[in-house]
Each structure stands twice: as C-alpha cells, then as structure tokens.
C-alpha cells in the first residue's frame, strides 16, 4: 500500500499467504467499517493461470484480512472471483465471478463474525449475454450506492441491480 498524496515505490505487505501458501494474485478489495479487508484471489496474475507451476493455493478464494493480521477464508466456490463489495449495512457481501462458462454475481449473507453463510446467485449474465451478443466484457469490479443498488462492470458496460438482484439497466 502506498499513500496517494505522496506516491513512491515503498509498499507494505498486509497479507501474502494463506496457511503458509502464497496467494494466486489478489485482485479486488472492499474494506468494512471495522477496517477489515475482504479481497478476491483469482489466478489472473499467474502466467499459466491454474496450471502455473508457481501456484501454491489450488483454488481461487475470497478472503478476509482481520485487523490482527489473520487471514480467514470466506469462500472458495467461484472459479474466477473478481469484483467485490459490501452492502451499506455490511450484512451482505457481493462477489463477481468472471469465469466465461459461469458468469455470475453472488451474494453472501454475512455472520456477525464477518464470515459468509452459503451464497446464492444474485444475477447470472449467461442469458443476458445471449440476448445482447454484441456486448463484450466480463463480470468485474462493482460498488454499492447508499440505497443498496449494485453498480457492476460487466458485458457491455456498467450493469445496475436492485438490492434484490433485479437488473435495472445498463450504462
């Protein structure tokens, strides 16, 4: 992490490993109000992705870096976890899966300790892609507004969803 007001090539590693194994390539992140950091770890930074001989973790995970420096595995049910954000009340975690054959966004209800209960598909962009074949791009970064609407980059632009997962439109 480098301060933006005086950027320089000095970085502090907050977390580099899970259970003694180096992360694949941490990607997107979201802080909660406690100062804990949720982040995704797809294989995009590895030259050969899942087949890279330097790969140490054999899955792509979603993690929580606690304030005490401990890393907890939140989930490993996505092939390409990418964009990540929290609902305004921080009771729901949203994660984009940018895997071509299964392009979905999932929502996870969070327990009091910040860990996820079983997730559910929030929006599957497979049918959306079929209806709009000219709209290129995959599920990626996202943010939530004060009303809980999710603004997510995806096929053809920024898709806007209600908190219930209804597609409101695309910019």
Where are the regions that the model predicts?
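A short loop-to-beta-strand structural motif that recurs across blades of beta-propeller domains
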Residues: 1, 60-63, 104-106, 157-159
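Beta-propeller fold detector
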Residues: 10-16, 73-76, 116-124, 169-171
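A detector of repeated loop/turn-to-beta-strand junctions in beta-rich toroidal repeat architectures
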Residues: 56-60, 102-104, 116
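Beta-rich, blade/repeat-based domains predominating
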Residues: 19-37, 56-61, 73-95, 125-155
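Short loop/turn segments immediately following beta-strands, especially the blade-tip
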Residues: 3-6, 107-115
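Short coil turn/linker residues within repeat-based beta-strand modules
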Residues: 6-9, 67-70, 112, 164-167
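Conserved beta-strand positions in repeat-built beta-propeller and related beta-rich domains
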Residues: 1, 37-46, 93-100, 149-155, ...
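Asp-box/WD-like beta-propeller blade repeats and closely related beta-sheet repeat scaffolds
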Residues: 2-53, 59
């Amino acid at each position: 992490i480098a301060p933006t007001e005086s950027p320089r090539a000095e970085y502090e590693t907050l977390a580099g490993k899970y259970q003694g194994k180096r992360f694949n390539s941490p990607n997107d992140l979201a802080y909660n109000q406690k100062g804990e950091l949720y982040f995704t770890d797809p294989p995009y930074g590895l030259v050969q992705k899942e087949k890279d001989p330097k790969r140490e973790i054999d899955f792509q995970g979603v993690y929580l870096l606690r304030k005490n420096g401990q890393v907890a595995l939140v989930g490993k049910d996505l092939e390409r976890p990418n964009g990540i954000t929290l609902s305004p009340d921080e009771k729901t975690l949203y994660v984009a899966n940018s895997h071509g054959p299964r392009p979905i966004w999932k929502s996870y209800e969070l327990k009091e300790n910040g860990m996820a209960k079983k997730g559910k598909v929030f929006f599957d962009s497979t049918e959306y892609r079929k209806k709009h074949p000219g709209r290129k791009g995959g599920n990626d970064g996202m943010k939530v507004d004060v009303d809980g609407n999710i603004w997510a980059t995806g096929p053809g632009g920024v898709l806007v969803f209600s908190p219930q997962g209804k597609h409101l439109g695309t910019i």
